[in-house]
Amino acid sequence: MKILFNNTFELFCLFVFVTWALFLNNNGILYPVHCLKSAGDTYVDTLRGSNFNNEFIDLLSTRDICNTIKNYITREQIKCAISYDVLNISNIINSLEKTLLRDHNIIINGKEDILKKYLNTFLTLYIKRQSEDVNNFIKKFSNSKLDVVINYRYYEEKFLSEYEEIDSLKKGFSNHISEIKDILNNISSSNNYKKKSGVIYFPDVKETLYSKIQILKEILCKLRNKVSFMYNINFALDEFKENFDKQVYNFKGKEGLNDFVRITSDITNPTSTFTNVVDINKFNVNTQMDEIQNGTLSKEHLNDFRRNIINLDVHIRDPSSFCVNQVENPTEMNINNPCNNNDGNNINCKDLVEEDAMLNHFSFLLHHLEKMTCILIFSLKNKISSARDDIQKDINKMESELINVSNEINRLDIVVDVPQHHILNYHNKNENKVFNLMNIKNEYYEYLGGHNKINNNFDDFDNTLMLLERKTNWIKDQNIMTYGDREDIHEAISSTLEMIDKLKDMYVTENFNLLITYENLYKEINLFLYNKQYNISEEAYIYAWNSLENFKGKKLLTEGIDRLLGSVMSISYVIKYVKVANKHLNPQICFNLNKLSNAFMNIEEKLVLYRNQFYRLNHDITTLKLFKNNIEKLGYAYRDNMNKVHINMDTYNIATENLQHEIDNILENISDVLYEDMLINELKTMRATWKNFVYVKYDYFKQNNKLIEEFDENKLIIFPPQFGLMKQSEQTNIRNDNNNNNNNNNNNSNNNNNNNNNNKDNSVASLGSSILTRTSSPDNYLIGQNFIKSPYYNLLYEFATEKINCAKTPEERIKSFGEIYRTIDRVSSVIKENRKNLRSKYDNMRIEILKLIDYRKHTFEETKDVHKELIRLEGFILNTLDNLFAKRMTLSVQMKNSVEMLKGSLYKDKLPDYCKAVEMFIPKYFLTMTRWRNFLLEYRKIMPSRVISKFYST
């Protein structure tokens, strides 16, 4: 029995020894980390799982340090995971070390060496382990519809690539504009175009300059497209933000985080550190943890466990955060609440601990993912907006430079001596020249000056042309070698010249008739395009098209001119052959032959010119109907879009008027709020002054009931002289009375040898005398004058006098006088209440203004879209008209009514400058009355005084 007892005792001692050794070697048991009791927390696992100093573990178990490290590292990891930023561990460690030493110096006091010794190792391990959790969480959060990383990096890449292209375009523009300026600076001003060494002449570089100008225009067009693209990126980011918010909400519902965050957010009683959350007297850590690991725990013990282990620290959300309506760091709420009540007596708490730990961890990561995504989107939008504004400024400068060099090139092009071409200038061979119809009329009437009136008879034209062709054939059939001996050949050629001249006159007249027909059609087309009431069923419109389709002289202008030119060229060839074949003709015959040759050559040039200028105006009926259908289809679309533009601009102008009215109201409201703030600040100064005045005058009014006597005579005596309510003479009388009283007190005190009273009276007298002397001097010592002028002064006067009047006995009255300055608090409460109401109105007004700004912006953007469509339609209409008129008519009406020409007057923003300034300022985040005050002072010159008169009067 004894041997058995000894063996049992030895085994028990061995068990105790081994257990004690394990306790000594396990820092996690001796120094438990109380910052997070949730299972699976990376921070706790890292802190427990490494051999760190016990003081270091206690230090990093502190709630504030724990939260700082976890929040900072998690934010940086999420930011680098979403964007293209590289996670620099050394920089993070250095920043965290500085932050901890700066912000938590009270907690770390005396432990800096321990912190610096182990912090690097701990943070390196923690960052590596936390990175895996962050990456896995982001993968779990993302789905096929919305991958946060892919979406954000897509927009970031787009912005960076567009910015690189923009920079390249700006450099290209700068290089081309510099080359143009160098060429213009080296161009000789002389009109002598003979080549000289080292001198550049405009005709030599004209094509180069115009080609470079075209390149510059294309660059500007591309830059404008880039600006539009950046607007689209911002809109896309807004849509991405909305989709992200939906994804966050769905993810919370899917993972059960909504109910978890709602329940845990009810806990609001904070504790200072993590190590203080366990009450050792009420709860045994080892016993309870063993029960949890065993998987069972009674309901009573569980409730006790929840009451003592629960982490009650809840951080108040920063109102300046970019993302609103989010739970702030869910791991800081209800961290160690592992179990909920259950109907059974025994609860499997191990599963509940793991479940709540997972919810804690998910809600913590989700919070930071939501916050950092919002910050990244907001930052990217700011970068895009800033870059877009800079590009727009650069575009304006580039346009100015382009206009300057274009004007200089046009000036040089005009001064160059280039022959002026006219439609009836027979030596003109520029068939692509566009002529003005009025010039054509004038030149035609000049042409008719030396002719009888021409009456076109198409039968006469055909008969004359047939006779000309017969004579031409007869001349061609004759023996040219016998020209010198035969008069009949010469007479036949001379007669053909007369017939050709007659046919030419008829041809010119018919061309003019065709131009007049086109002119009438052009007038009707313009009425259709630019007159809302005009309709294509108008008789004049139908007649104009029918006149062109059924133009009688079309055959004369096409087949007739070809036959006439053939005869002229044949006779010219015969004359040329006669001159070559007959070398020894009579001089008179040679003279006559040369005269005929020159006449035929001149007529041939004229006819070729006419044919080149007007031949393409003779469209067939099918082509004319195609032009007619295109013009009508495009015209109706053009008119509809122009009508939309006018309607949108009317709506825009109405919204502008409403916006101006709302801005005037909110500025007046802000002026009132700032005025109330100024009055509140003045009341603080007035209260201190009044309190000092009561202290000085209390003994004076207390003697012989002087307060009753003087108050009945003048109720203003209860107010300090610094308020400026009494006249200077009244203040002087009071001062003299006070000095006399003080002198009497001094004499009495000397006779009675009462040193204490003497000292008090002397101090009071000197203080009162100094105050009265100072306040009776000029007005620059007066205080609270803005309040005195305000309607609230009557309220203060009523409160103050009522307080004295309500006192029934002299003692109560002097007691009321001692507290009289507190009436300012009542007035201040009234002002604050009014300010609160004004501030509430301000919030509503701001919401309405933001809606109006968005509505105006939406309307203007819609108008711009319609304007782009108008430009496109206008281009099609101009192209159709050019083809219809064969580029032989200047489209002056289209130029005058072009949407580009009307853009300045049509799209003019009638909003005053001060409203534009408010429109740019009011959408900003975190607007305070201080920022509004600075804004009003900055734009004081343009602000209307009638709206913010109270603010400027102070």
UniProtKB/Swiss-Prot annotation:
Q: Where is the composition biased (Low complexity)?
A: 736-763
Q: Which residues form a coiled coil?
A: 381-415
Q: Where in this protein does the record put region Disordered? A: 733-765
Q: Which keywords label this protein?
A: Coiled coil, Merozoite, Signal
Region forming the signal peptide: 1-35
Application of this enzyme or protein: Possible candidate for an effective malaria vaccine as determined by epitope response in sera.
Gene Ontology cellular component terms for the protein in this record: host cell
Q: What is this protein called?
A: Uncharacterized protein PF3D7_1404800
Organism of this sequence: Plasmodium falciparum (isolate 3D7)
